[in-house]
Amino acid sequence: IIVCPDGDVTSWYFDSPIDKKMRYETYLFKELVESIDNTYNTIAEKSGRAITGLSMGGHGAFYLAFRHQEVWGAAGSMSGGVDIRPFPKNWDLSKRLGDYAIYKENWENNTVINMVHLLKGDDLKLIFDCGVDDFFFDANKRLHTKLLERNIPHDYTERPGGHSWDYWANSIKYQLLFFNDYFAY
């Protein structure tokens, strides 16, 4: 079963500490998963679930998987915004987290690159990639380095390309192969 929930363009998949109506983390990791498990014949445990996304959804997939390793056994990100701090004026982030100068703690606590400490060994299978011409490239490379420093196994790929549907049309093939192998075990 593949489920593609709407990320509302700028939800960033967390529960906003500023806008209490933005409860995407709760919706996705709790309400949606429970609804799918109650409606369909699923493997209702982490070994039967994976999450992935692109761009904001790549941030969201890793954010949710890092924070809720009891829900997902594998996670992927394509061109993910894995460090949102360099972009305080973009994509409604200040509406979700508050002004960076005032609410720096919100930004530090809700960016994927600062959540690597939550990972333990190879308990969560990870795949991510980014095009070398993508504005998120540097952040993905830094995440890769942090994972290496902590000896967290992961698949990471850099390829030609930017932040585009052409790039993701190619990237998704590798993600699907990775998840197919994950579910085969």
Where are these predicted regions, by residue range?
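Non-catalytic cap/lid and distal C-terminal segments of serine-dependent acyl enzymes
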Residues: 1-185
